[in-house]
Curated annotation (Swiss-Prot):
PROSITE patterns: PEROXIDASE_2 (PS00436), PEROXIDASE_4 (PS50873). This is Catalase-peroxidase 1. Keywords: Heme, Hydrogen peroxide, Iron, Metal-binding, Oxidoreductase, Peroxidase. One of its GO terms (cellular component) is cytosol. Formation of the three residue Trp-Tyr-Met cross-link is important for the catalase, but not the peroxidase activity of the enzyme. Belongs to the peroxidase family. Peroxidase/catalase subfamily. It comes from Idiomarina loihiensis (strain ATCC BAA-735 / DSM 15497 / L2-TR).
Amino acid sequence: MTKSSGGGKCPIMHGSMTSEKKTNTHWWPNSLKLEILRQHDTKANPLDEDFNYAEEFKKINLEELKQDLKNFMTDSQEWWPADWGHYGGLMIRMAWHSAGSYRLADGRGGGGTGNQRFAPLNSWPDNVSLDKARRLLWPIKKKYGNKLSWADLFILAGNMAYESMGLKTFGFAGGREDIWHPEEDTYWGSEKEWLAETKNRYSSDEERDSLENPLAAVQMGLIYVNPEGVDGNPDPLRTAKDVRETFKRMAMNDEETCALTAGGHTVGKCHGNGKEENLGPEPEAADVEEQGMGWRNSGGKGVGRDTMSSGIEGAWTTNPTQWDNGYFYLLFNYEWELKKSPAGAWQWEPIDIKEEDKPVDVEDPSIRHNPIMTDADMAMKMDPDYRKIAEKFYKDPEYFADVFARAWFKLTHRDLGPKDRYLGADVPEEDLIWQDPIPKVDYSLSEQEIADLKEKLLNTELTSYELISTAWDSARNFRCSDFRGGANGARIRLAPQKDWHGNEPEKLHKVLRVLEDLQSTLDKKVSLADLIVLGGTAAVEKAAKDAGYNVTVPFAPGRGDATDEQTDVESFEPLEPLHDGYRNYLKKDYAVPAEELMLDRTHLMGLTAPEMTVLVGGMRALGANYGESEHGVFTDRVGTLTNDFFVNLTDMNNVWKKADDHYEVRDRKTDELKWTASRIDLVFGSNSILRSYSELYAQDDNQEKFVKDFVKAWTKVMNADRFDL
């Protein structure tokens, strides 16, 4: 851009929309934040509309890609030289920190989207120097282009780092699609500063399992725990509690946790040979000439042995570029004492260590340094339960390698979803329970057979309410965050779902009994999962017909029925619907307003704001509220798929009044009570954005559009977990 000579006025108004403007949220902080639902909008995605990542990934010569990554590991670059000439440790840390932000509570975080490229993760204190790891990989990403997502590359790079250092990994699956902007739905904590004291997210400082839900890290900006100890105070037994709780929140048991801790620290090193004040701003705060990188180090050479990342300095093992059992050898054969790193961080170092057991310097093999352990590493020795596991691993290296390889695969694939989404030749054949396996079906249904089944379902003793609500309950716990839940598998009939309060166990038991009886009379095998969805679909179709619209609600057979043996009860507990605005359900009163809870569920279901609106209006008209509650059922034609909810919501002849724990809809002139409503019902008339959608569906010329849009959104919910379609 060429400057003209002489001064001139700024070409934009100061305080423009591209700088520090006051947002609507600033002026009205309690307004409903619908932005999280816009993440499902594809406008920010620069790829062609018909781009299919799965098809592109299949074009990759996977063996060539893996060899490229192996060659890359030892191709040290002068601008960011590899420790001991091998990038393995750096790539493993990058992959780990990509996948390790996953939490079981809501399925968010994790390595499934390449989110490490964007704020806040790209600038977290725990991710110092990972900007360099990503830039080092750019030539490989550039070569493979659209066929290889950043998200898949991060994980595969970690895999190949281990392979290149001697570990046989359990496998690899592609299929992670990149996002193109920061995620707005993920709650990382309420703190306003990095590494704020843990008291900010624990209800009790002593009870280390009181970490705020859904968080799975002890401090803002960390992946798991503070490596120096709780709040930077070394105490391995106390740190063990943090390790156990944070890994539990990622669905890891003690054995997996110990294996991951040891295996992750068998290779690579920590970097703290300098002063923290020598580091420049993080990527998001760095100047434009840094080109998206940050933490420029002004100390010494700023790279190599002078690298600064965590502040802890040293390698864990004697041979940090080789997979072996050296971690346990050093941990158990030496006593360890607390020391300070050159950067002033707490670390554990061995007492009277043999010279040959020390790792060599990253630049000069004639120099040796003490190995180190973090407080979390010492927890593996000092916590009695972890110690038993660690001793077993020490005595049986092959067992350790197998447990670690499986745990690493779980860590890096947990949020990829079921195996139907896995891509590539290295997908393990073995089904693992955390993948929520579902048996494949061996039947198909013709259109006539589907029509006959619909008729049989409608002729059972089940009401439309029972059919629709059960189908909805079966499908609604799908999460687009980690692709778990949904109607496929019919797990609504198994523990724990069959007993969830929100699934109305008594009603559910009746519905399942009737459907199982019908299933036993059919001429051909049809899964219960298909019958549950088809029952709701048939009832919706009938409700549309009763409203005067002959529409066919799409139905795709092919769902299987999972078994108890294929279901990890404990890991399904977080999927329990404690709230569901679509059925006007709250298990109890929560500090968070019901409408905000609904937005969270809507996002996890992969729905947009218009889809949410049409579904709520339709479910109210169908009378599908929890327990057949009348809140929000603004119609005299309950069970008919009409737009009455929107017509009456926007009718200025009505007035809304607070009454105890609900609202009353009264005639503006006579004060006659017409209906009752919840906060969720009223928000579709009070929020300006949602009201615009409500007005659209209330229009006289949009009654048919309402029916068609409801059917489309209903079908999307029913098929959300059908990755085979």
